[in-house]
Amino acid sequence: MDLKQKYIFIEGTNCPVTVRGRLLQVFRRSVSGELFKGLWLVLREMLRFNIHTTQYPKEKLPLSPRYRAIHELLRLLESGNERCIGCGLCEKICISNCIRMETSYGEDGRKKVHEYTINFGRCIFCGFCAEVCPELAIVHGGRYENASEQRAHFGLKEDMLTPMERFMNQGQKEFPGFGALSQDADSKVKKTPLAYFTPKGEENV
């Protein structure tokens, strides 16, 4: 077995160093037609009105249920109470160590969450906190338009928890699950035709 490697020497083009040489290089490339080919391609597509640009913010692309944006704390649909039971699993599994919560036991003996904060300066949006939550209390929402002076404006409990007014107006969207498909998933999947012939020679699809 021959273990010797064979190297091939490729002669590279010498880049011009002087100003005159660079100007000549630009002139040669312009005359050769590379510049005009690109301009003609842009002009042709513009005249055909073959535009694929999304006119944001008037037009917005649909987001997949698996999209991981700013976190949201959900409420129970039956009573409107907070779903979070203060188990602390999200705080323990967070690999960025950016989740903090303060809990205590109330008069009814149930654990209550007083403070729940996420440091979005360290969060990498891995989604582990949402996956491990047994009550689907913390999920990743679709809110990606987050213009603010500080990241802390989105990481407090009162910012992430569904407001009661919006909840009463049925404004809380249920989390479809990590395996959920997008609404237009069928149009994006290339379907393979399953055509075969029966013994009688009739074609079935």
Swiss-Prot record:
Free-text cofactor note: Binds 2 [4Fe-4S] clusters per subunit.
Annotated residues for binding of [4Fe-4S] cluster 1: C84, C87, C90, C133
Family matches, as PANTHER family: NADH DEHYDROGENASE [UBIQUINONE] IRON-SULFUR PROTEIN 8, MITOCHONDRIAL (PTHR10849:SF20), NADH DEHYDROGENASE UBIQUINONE IRON-SULFUR PROTEIN 8, MITOCHONDRIAL (PTHR10849)
Gene Ontology BP annotations: aerobic respiration
Membrane topology per record: Peripheral membrane protein
Protein name, per record: NADH-quinone oxidoreductase subunit I
Entry keyword set: 4Fe-4S, Cell inner membrane, Cell membrane, Iron, Iron-sulfur, Membrane, Metal-binding, NAD, Quinone, Repeat, Translocase, Ubiquinone
Catalytic activity: a quinone + NADH + 5 H(+)(in) = a quinol + NAD(+) + 4 H(+)(out)
GO cellular component labels: plasma membrane
